[in-house]
Amino acid sequence: GYHRAAGEPHAEIECLADARAKGIDPRGATMAVTLEPCNHHGKTPPCSEALIEAGIARVVFGLRDPNPLAAGGLERLRQAGIDVTGPVLEQECRDLIADFLVWQTEQRPYVILKLASTLDGRISTRNRQRQQISNAASHHNVHLLRAGIGHCGGAVLIGGGTFRADNPALTARTVPTDRQPLACILTSRLPQPTADFQLLRDRPQDTIFFVSPAACASTVAHALGEKGVRVFSVGPGINGRPDFPALFKLLRQDLGCPYILCEGGGK
């Protein structure tokens, strides 16, 4: 069993349902879980109570739940007489649910870097002309990744240079998807609303610009907003560079974005 989406049954509930659907009585069984079973009423009932009611005899867990609101499941299981073993394979479990741990402990999106480079570390020719480095299989994998991120409500992030030089669509095109990722551009210069960019023409409602406070208050930003494009202010951080922690916080907490796929250039 696995947790398919927020608000859906957790992995433990899915596992119990799968066993019963196959005619297997879980009573007296051992259940191995990556994360401590939750112990609170949120979008779903507590998994700890479901395991107790199912008659599970032993639970082997990998990690304690970092969310204090959901923690406490292990103690509840022990109180009910269930044998609890763990933590086990902690690093492997951390790697398996690295995105979830980032959401819970840092309240930001999980950031993925997409990078194609030559063996000597180059990403373009000497005169900065575009040169294909990746093969067809790599291109297909990028579209798979975009499709998955889009399905979850995630975003692709690029800089203004990539936006202006490549005029990208930032969509999943070679694989079926029910939802395209958001297109986020971090730039010092907003485009004119009438400029012929794919994102402005075809996907204005999915396009978000992150700019300085002054640019965010400009007439260009207002005109883009009338087209459905969103423009947000991101102030300077360390050494005058964009404040990425603030950007990530905005994406996660205000826009609900769980993943960011970074596809920008060298800068």
Regions found by a protein language model. Name each.
Residues 102, 108, 112-258:
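Active-site ligand-binding patch in enzyme domains
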Residues 74, 88-116:
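Proteins enriched for Cys/Gly/acidic motifs involved in redox and nucleic-acid/cofactor modification
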Residues 1-92, 182, 213:
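Zn2+-dependent cytidine deaminase-like catalytic core
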Residues 191, 266-267:
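Short Gly/Pro-enriched loop/turn and capping motifs at secondary-structure junctions
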Residues 12, 43-47, 70, 138, ...:
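Amphipathic coiled-coil/heptad-repeat helices and related helical stalk/stem segments
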Residues 262:
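Gly/Thr-rich phosphate-binding loop signature of adenosyl cofactor/nucleotide-binding cores
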Residues 64, 161, 265:
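Flexible loop residues that form catalytic
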Residues 10, 41-42, 68-72, 95, ...:
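Residues that form or flank phosphate/diphosphate-binding pockets in enzymes
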